[in-house]
Amino acid sequence: MTAPLELEQIRKAPKALLHDHLDGGLRPSTVLDIAGQTGYDGLPATDVEELATWFRTRSHSGSLERYLEPFSHTVAVMQTPEALHRVAYECVEDLAEDSVVYAEIRFAPELHINRGMSFDEIVDAVLAGFADGEKACAAAGRPIVVRLLVTAMRHAAVSREIAELAIRWRDKGVVGFDIAGAEAGNPPTRHLEAFDYMRDHNARFTIHAGEAFGLPSIHEAIAFCGADRLGHGVRIVDDIDVLADGPDKGKVRLGRLANILRDKRIPLELCPSSNVQTGAVKSIADHPFDLLARTRFRVTVNTDNRLMSDTYMSREMHRLVQAFGYGWSDLERFTINAMKSAFIPFDERLAIIDEVIKPRYAVLIG
């Protein structure tokens, strides 16, 4: 019997990340540094370890709404070009250190205007941080490609403006659009104008759906909004039955929505640890990730918010390995799923799969 993969082994594997929030992945030390530099005095702790613990425990709240509350502190220290550049640069460094070779990072420009920056200045600062981080990592022998998704908050009314922002920057590092925030009372159909604008410009978008809210959210995101991917989408399990008895015991039966999702190969940006924190699932072992993977949905592994969940890609993969016994071939499949689903051109996706991911996994598999 093959020994289970250890965390340090998984660290060596190339990874592709599709769902990670810039304002949810700051280093605790950076939060403290920028707070001191900018005069923000609202932090709940002044010690690095205490602050990290506060973010983790406060985010383990059991609901999406309470999970989102700690973001007020990270957003508060991301209100200058210098702060945004630093956070973006360090994001690239941290991902590359974890052997991530491709990442799409998202954030909501509308949350960073408190000190007078325009949306374009905000995006420019983040992309400059990404570019400088990529150069530094390449020079250090850890090449990585990082692209940006601009997010509109679903409770606000600027989604069309953010969609226009995505198109203005589409050839400079922005590869798509997203809506995020509390799902309850904020259906994706409120933002049809933004999604129509993206389609009119042949652009890609993902939608947070099926995280805290159920099947109606997923149905609207796919049927009415035309999402290319689903942020989370974990509640699609509500449309899947595993027969408990009879001659077909154990057989999986999909409802119509689940069938459409699988048939159209719509990627699921699954974030296991985050889903436990928000109460979407009780534990990693209870997460429907394995059911969805075995049923051949296009599942991907993601971090969501590295600071709030005290996580990183290797840890997310290791937790899935511990829960479901996955081996190298499984992790390779999930990684290729993510790379196939990226919002960069086909030839660029294929090059990373064929020239980076497959060769490095071939060495690991042996």
Swiss-Prot record:
Q: Does the keyword Transmembrane helix apply?
A: no
* Active-site positions on this chain: E211 (proton donor)
Q: How is the cofactor bound?
A: Binds 1 zinc ion per subunit.
Which top-rank group of organisms is this from? Bacteria
Major enzyme class: hydrolase
- GO CC, alphabetical: cytosol
Binding locations of substrate: H21, D23, G181
Q: Where does Zn(2+) bind?
A: H19, H21, H208, D304
GO-annotated molecular function: 2'-deoxyadenosine deaminase activity; adenosine deaminase activity; zinc ion binding
* Record HAMAP family: A_deaminase
What family does the database annotate? Belongs to the metallo-dependent hydrolases superfamily. Adenosine and AMP deaminases family. Adenosine deaminase subfamily.
Task: Explain the purpose of this protein.
Answer: Catalyzes the hydrolytic deamination of adenosine and 2-deoxyadenosine.
Protein name, UniProt field: Adenosine deaminase
Q: What is the lineage of its organism?
A: Bacteria, Bacillati, Actinomycetota, Actinomycetes, Mycobacteriales
